[in-house]
Amino acid sequence: MKTCKVSDLFWVNYGVNLELNALEQDMNGINFVSRTSNNNGVSAKVKRISSVEPLPAGTITVAGGGSVMETFLQMAPYYSGRDLYYLTPKVAMSNEVKLYYCHCLRSNKYKFSYGRQANVTLRDLQI
């Protein structure tokens, strides 16, 4: 099977790095995605911040620390916590293809146990 670097397929960006405890929760607000492995990475819904544009729906989130390599396709705009990366496809991809790559990324989780983070190596990771 042929593999390629994550950065060959996706633009790899660091999220907006917000702290949930500094935000106002709002049941009808914007998803707040963190490094959790639960609920598609969404840990709360928060009030929109006028000075911060939410990250776009259709991107893939990857935890660089915490629950390292927890990877999810985000179906709605969202804000992100610390050590969270988001991947934007370089070419058009269906949601099914994005979900496949979520699985490929998550299958590399074993490489980052015992406190190792994926923050430096994510772009060059072979999938």
Question: Predicted regions span which residues?
Answer:
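Structural beta-strand/beta-sheet cores of well-ordered domains, especially the beta-sheet scaffolds
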Residues: 16, 28-33, 58-60, 83, ...
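A short beta-sheet element
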Residues: 45-106, 121
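Short loop/beta submotifs within extracellular cysteine-rich repeat domains
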Residues: 14, 40-41, 108-113
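Intrinsic, low-complexity N-terminal interaction/targeting segments
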Residues: 102-119, 124-127
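Short, flexible, glycine/charge-rich loop motifs used to bind or transfer phosphoryl groups or to couple energy/partner
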Residues: 21-23, 50, 74-75, 115
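Flexible, active-site-adjacent loop/turn segments at secondary-structure boundaries
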Residues: 16, 30, 70, 76-77, ...
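Non-catalytic DNA-recognition/assembly elements of restriction-modification systems
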Residues: 1-19, 23-40
